[in-house]
Amino acid sequence: MTKKQFKHGVLFYHEHTGIKDIYRGLGDVATSLTTFCRHLSIQLSENEGDIITFCQKIKDKRYSDDVDIIFILGGDGTVNELVNGIMKSELNLPIGIIPGGTFNDFVKTLNLNPRHKMASQQLMNAELRPYDVMKINDEYALNFVGLGLIVQNAENVQNGNKDIFGKLSYVGSTVKTLLNPEHFDYKISVDNQTVDGNTSMLVVANGPFIGGSRIPLTDLSPNDGYLNTFIFKEQSSSVLNDVFKQRDSMNWNKMTEGIKHLPAKKITIETDPQMKVDIDGEINLKTPLEIEVIPNAIQILTLPEAQATNQPESE
């Protein structure tokens, strides 16, 4: 993007992001965004739900009458709030995502650097691409829905404990958690098929990255009109170990005995007992769930794969 492609961009941020000096970070990001936005507004989101309210104001032209792109600086939870704001207000505007939190799984899908300064510079060469959105009951998400161990993981992270599915080794309490997972009964309907059983973890994925690691399934795409349900069979902690380590070249076929994979457009999930649900790192819902894919629902700035190769990760 060498010209001023957009008239008015709005950059949302929280003061409590993963960036140590948020104001310096905002300066770095704004330096890049103003190269392709004629006008850039920087908007603080003070409370949960503020971004959804701002999106409705933008939709109603009460914020400004010329906003034509929205940027978000934050982690997956903040991105999730923006996606809900876009979808619930039916705001047909493209978005740009700049990493600034503990996890930025979808940033990897966009081929962007995990550092906010570099990622904002890469947006200058990015192009808009359509992505599917997941609708979960009355909420929306870009990346995944998880039950079981993945919820335990999110709660551990929120409490300041070690991340089970992140980059750290499987040692200490992590091993104990994997070896002694809590199991639950499930009944899942995917399109015209019904499956039931008992498991320690269940994931419905749209994007290919969860907890910083790639799901080792080569044709998993966030814009193919399908969602992918993964049921982790009982006593499959070694499979959990493998899946959530960074092994991009892993042969998925070797693990099919430990994981059941069900692609679908519509999914219903019932559990006994009722289970908490992790949606892109946010634990706000409980089962039962009705999930469907909304194809090509949102346009997001994406760095072409060729330009993402060999990008430095330094500030």
From Swiss-Prot:
Coiled-coil region(s): none
Pfam families: DAGK_cat (PF00781), YegS_C (PF19279)
Keyword terms of this UniProt record: ATP-binding, Kinase, Lipid biosynthesis, Lipid metabolism, Magnesium, Metal-binding, Nucleotide-binding, Phospholipid biosynthesis, Phospholipid metabolism, Transferase
Any one GO CC term of the record: plasma membrane
EC number(s) recorded for this UniProt protein: 2.7.1.-
Cofactor descriptive note: Binds 1 Mg(2+) ion per subunit. This ion appears to have a structural role and is required for catalytic activity.
UniProt cofactor(s): Mg(2+)
Enzyme class, spelled out: transferase
Biological process according to GO: phospholipid biosynthetic process
Transmembrane regions listed in the UniProt entry: none
Domain DAGKc: residue ranges: 1-140
Chain sites annotated for binding Mg(2+): S221, D224, Y226
Domain of life: Bacteria
SUPFAM superfamilies registered for this protein in UniProt: NAD kinase/diacylglycerol kinase-like
Residues at the active site: E282
Family: Belongs to the diacylglycerol/lipid kinase family.
Record-linked NCBIfam families: YegS/Rv2252/BmrU family lipid kinase
Known role: May catalyze the ATP-dependent phosphorylation of lipids other than diacylglycerol (DAG).
Protein's name in the database: Putative lipid kinase SSP1993
Source organism (scientific name): Staphylococcus saprophyticus subsp. saprophyticus (strain ATCC 15305 / DSM 20229 / NCIMB 8711 / NCTC 7292 / S-41)
